[in-house]
């Protein structure tokens, strides 16, 4: 087991789960949850329409090293737009739908980002978002 692998098939669909909770001080737990939530709001576009983190961090990326968002930013993609789809200004590993972006807009934007990162750094980014079907113009 690891961050990205749980020993199950990639296409497995989970319909329920059972969690084992550990008892703790309620006030401390609430404070920690609020701190985590505040950090996410400060660093990610949580109030925007996104599919979440768009690209996986490159294999072998250490916690302080090579990150997809850093590669995207270095390739000049922060704020890049196709139609109503945009690379987030706040965290550039998120693609935002500003209202009427089509699947084709998002696909084109994502592939443009991948190509620019490859051209700039030699690193191929892999989609983290599971795309289904085909995007049509």
Give the role of each language-model region.
Residues 1-108, 115, 119-137:
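Phosphate/pyrophosphate- and phosphate-bearing ligand-binding catalytic cores of soluble enzymes
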């Amino acid at each position: 087991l690891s961050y990205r692998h749980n020993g199950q098939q990639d296409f497995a669909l989970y319909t329920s789960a059972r969690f084992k909770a550990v008892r703790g001080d309620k006030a401390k737990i609430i404070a920690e949850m609020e701190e985590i939530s505040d950090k996410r709001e400060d660093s990610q576009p949580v109030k925007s329409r996104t599919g979440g983190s768009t690209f996986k961090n490159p294999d072998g990326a250490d916690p302080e090293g090579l990150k997809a968002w850093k590669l995207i930013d270095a390739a000049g993609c922060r704020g890049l737009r196709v139609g109503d789809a945009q690379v987030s200004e706040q965290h550039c590993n998120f693609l935002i739908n500003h209202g009427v972006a089509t699947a084709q807009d998002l696909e084109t934007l994502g592939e443009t980002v991948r190509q620019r990162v490859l051209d700039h750094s030699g690193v191929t980014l892999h989609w983290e978002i599971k795309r289904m079907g085909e995007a049509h113009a």
